[in-house]
Amino acid sequence: MSDEKLVPKLRFNGFDEEWNEVQISDIANVVGGGTPKTEIENYWNGDIKWFTPSEIGKTKYIHDSERHITEEGLNNSSAKLLPKNTLLLSSRATVGEISIALSECTTNQGFQSLITKNNVDNEFIYYLISTIKNEFLRRSSGSTFLEISKNEINKIKINIPTLSEQKRISELLSAIDNKIELLDSKHENYQNFKKYLMRQIFAQKLRFDFKMFKLKELSKINKGKQLNKDDMLENGKYYVLNGGKEPSGYTNEWNTLENTITISEGGNSCGFVNFNEEKFWSGGHCYYLSNLSKNVDDYYLFSYLKFIEPKIMRLRVGSGLPNIQKGDIENIKIKILPMNEQLKISNLLLSMDKKVNSIAIQKENIKIFKKGLLQQMFV
């Protein structure tokens, strides 16, 4: 029998008591949901929020639902009216996803929600549940989709400290979440402002003298070389860019120079425009631009192509695996300004992109820090 104490690796000063092992049934009432009959109009479009699993887990708190039911629908179904601060826990398909309800609500039958008792901090349990998602999945069953029963959830064992320590932990993690949310907002605001600037510049709301050129008059359009999955590495020096928005793998060889514009040739993301700041391997479903004309700045051209990206994506043909023909790419029309204006625009948009990327890196670092805390502050 182990003498190891039930304590976390990392905890606040002043707390030294051992944590207690309990079942979820000891700290919360588990409540299922239901769906009123959809063919009865009087059951729907009322004032009572009614959540489905697809709406849960994206954010810590959830306020409103996509659909609403009436009191008559509530009374004539197995849906239950849940109080504010209920932990909405998905028990079907996306098992273990969780959000906190900011107001009274109901759910469909894809939930086993937790109404916590007086001896626990609601937000602490929210964070704790996020650390044991694998336990929910392990206890789930089903052939069409996974599902975990109320009985199985009740039996899950968790470790909790005193209420005061629970609150200290949840306060810290909440502060970190607030910082992430603030960075999310800043990231979105900068992106929206950049889009606004691009509309003003490229939609000619700001007046410039310009000439129209076909893309093939400004650069050579090349198609990359296919690299088989067996030839890719998990941690190679150079990324492999194919038809998607993200690298499809890595390799220790490169075939395309840094500061190169690419356009996805095939797949669901065909038409996606990217600016590659380092050497990479251009794959078989990737167009890359080379031999740019002296009349165009590379980042200006990228920014203009990014602005018209929705139009480029509409050039796709084929239904199974859509693609964009090279001839259609070559004939894309580009608005070219005098070089001094191009450089001003490039510098402005590049500074915006650097700010957006800096915020994204900050956010990712905080998420990594939070993940480390979750691993060390819970038992």
What annotation goes with each model-predicted range?
Residues M1-Q23, K155, N159-K214, N331-V379:
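Amphipathic alpha-helical coiled-coil/heptad-repeat segments
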Residues K9-G34, W50, K155, R207-Q226, ...:
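Non-catalytic DNA-recognition/assembly elements of restriction-modification systems
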Residues N13-E18, Q112-D121, N134, R138, ...:
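Proline-centric
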Residues E18, K37-T38, N76, E181, ...:
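Short, solvent-exposed loop/turn positions at domain surfaces
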Residues G32-G33, I56, K133-N134, L206, ...:
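Generic structural signal for secondary-structure transition and capping sites
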Residues G34, G46-D47, T52-S54, Y61-S130, ...:
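A short beta-sheet element
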Residues K37-N45, N228-E234, V317:
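Short coil/turn segments at secondary-structure boundaries
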Residues T144-F145, G320:
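Extended, charge-rich, solvent-exposed interface segments
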